[in-house]
Each structure stands twice: as C-alpha cells, then as structure tokens.
Amino acid sequence: DSKSETVSPVPLPKSGPSQAHTEQALDMLRNAERPLAIAGGLIKGPECMAALTAFAETFDVPIASPQRRFHVFNSQHSHAAGRLPNRAPAPLLDLMKTTDLMLIIGDRGGPSMSQSFTFPRAPKPDHPLIHVWPDAQEIGRLWHPTLGIACDPEEFLKTMLAAGGGGKDRSGWVKELNDAHKNVMTWTPVSSNDGVVFGHVIQEIGKHLTENAVVTTDAGNFSSWPSQFLHLTQKNDFLGATVGAMGPGVPCAVAGGLSTPGRQVVAFCGDGGVMMTGNELATAVQYGVPLKLFIANNSAYGTIRMHQAKNFPGRVTATELRNPDFAAWGESFGAKGFLIQNESEVAETVAAAFKHDGAAVVETRISLNHISPSTTIEAIESS
C-alpha cells in the first residue's frame, strides 16, 4: 500500500479540423464515386466508434480496418469493406485499389496497413488521399496526401457529420466491396494429412465468442486465421502487435482481463510465440483471469518457414521446434488443459474450454503445410 495521492489521467486537449479543411474534405468526398475509408487505432471509445458508423452510413462510405484494429468497425455491417492485415487477400485488395478517394482516419499508416507501402503507394499515392491524424509531424512523413488534417479523428468525424451528407449514389460500390469482404470471411472447410487446418478451430470459437470479448493474438502466420475469419464488433477489443514482434499474445490477454474484469478473454498464440512469454499464464491464474488460450502448434517457426519456402525452397534451416505437451504445460500453471489432434475433436473440445469457469489452454496440432488461409508450403515451394 502507498500513502501517495492518487490522481486521474490528465485529459488531453482535442482539436477539430479547420473550416477550410472541412470544406475541402466535404467537397472531395461528395464528388467521389468510389471512396474508401481506413479507420485505425485512434477510433476508440463508444462515441468515436458510433461517429464512425454514422459517418459510413451518412456519406455512404465503406470502411476498412488495418492490421490488429479489426474491432473498430463491425465486420457484419453493410458498409464493412474488409480488413487490411499483412498480405491482404488479393481479390479484395485489387477491388479496394479501384477507389477514387482514400481516407485514412486515426491511423498514422505503416507497412502493414499499406501492404508494404503500395496502398497507398509511397511517397506519392495513386489516389487522392485525405489523412487525418493528431500529430502534424506525421502527416506527409511517408505519404504526400492531397489533404492532411492534423486533428482528433473523433472531432473530424463529428464535424463532417454536422455538415451533413450528400454526394453521389455509391450504393453499388458499397455493396461490391461488402460482398467481396463477406466472401473473404467465408470459411470453406479443407482438410490436411499433416494436422488440423486451423480454420476449423476458428469457426468453432466464433460460435462461443461474446460480443464484448477481448481478443488478443501473437505474431505469426497462424494469426491470419482469426484475422480473416473471426467476426468482431465495436464492443470487442482486438489487441496485438501491428508488426512481427513475437510474444504479446498472452501478456495482452492478461492485461485485458485485469483491466476490464468480467469480460471474456480469448488469446491466440503459435507454439513459437507462446514459448517466449506464455509464462504470464501464471499471472492470469493467480488473479483469476478466465483466459482461454488457443495454441496453434505446428512444431515450427511457421512464418520463417514460409519465407524459407519462398526464397530457399527445400532448404529448411533452424525452424523446426521440439515442443512440450502444451495441455500439460497449461495444467502446471493451474489452468485446464485440452488437446485437439484431429477435426472430429474440434467442436466438443472448444465448447468444453469455453464452458470451463477458469483459465484454459487448448493446444491444436495444426497443419504446417496449410500455413495460411491463402496458400500452402507445397504451393509456395512449387511456384
């Protein structure tokens, strides 16, 4: 205990867009036929998220979400345009690239969101670009936007809404993108002879996920499965590193559970990442966080293995892993351990894990060949 005085966080000042910037943004938006907004991590809190939804509906603008920010817009909303993780699905990305106006709202922009600085292209985008970010020093650092607005994203959205909607009929464009997005998020079951394809597990988890669950993911190719197939709402939180740093999955889940008690907490980790910081499971058990930890175990550093297949086919070096029994490992911390070794065990095991009151660890022996939803190791090596 401490006798130090407890103080609340200092409220940060929020600035809105200038009248000139508002008028220019309105003019650009109302004249666009195929606008696309990318909403980033500064879209947070109920009011800001509600403003984003109202903006999408009022101006008839489809909304995409970047890597690890998939909760900022309801993935089942009619104006959902899809997700921009690392290596976004080509059919969806190609359609997005036909936009005639991009808006980046509440995201500074980086290699993941921009698909390695190709969307928007750096330094000069292929499309007119409006970039909304509070720090003026960030605007123009990577891209030369048509209009850069240094202001709070929530204030931008509310100012635009106060000015009213209007513009061209974009219902066809919105539906075209939304249909492509829904197609990408539709899982077509496949099987493999080297383990469970992780999509089967994701589909079952989706049936048990609450609308306000905290979802975290570690770094690795396994994360492409929940990133592509797990539906999220604005009441969820989706946490994880936006680039390739391994290890945040379990600590993020513990922090999410401790800071928002009473919410469902679901974490995804690969076997490599969970061996780095998974010991924080002890903290979850100690403080009663009912964490459900799903470990995708392919006995490899899967992402590095994918790059080896692409750049040095047939030359596997230092990516194979000798792993513990993760179900027993989880039980050693006081969690309930589960193991999935084939597809027939998925539904029952996932249901049992969610039914368990406390922390649970679910190890799935997944296919290494099915390295992501879009390709296999065999296909990469033969290409």
Q: Which residue ranges define each predicted feature?
A:
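A short alpha/beta connector and helix-capping loop motif
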Residues: 147-157, 279-297, 373-378
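Glycine/aspartate-rich loop-and-adjacent alpha/beta segment that forms the canonical ThDP
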Residues: 1-16, 112-116, 343-383
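Glycine-rich phosphate/diphosphate-binding loops that line cofactor/substrate pockets in enzymes
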Residues: 21-35, 55, 95-99, 204-211, ...
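Conserved thiamine diphosphate
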Residues: 15, 95-99, 148, 156, ...
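Glycine-rich, acidic loop regions that bind phosphate or pyrophosphate groups
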Residues: 69-176, 350
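Active-site diphosphate/adenylate-binding microenvironment
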Residues: 178-260
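Thiamine diphosphate
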Residues: 91-111, 224-301
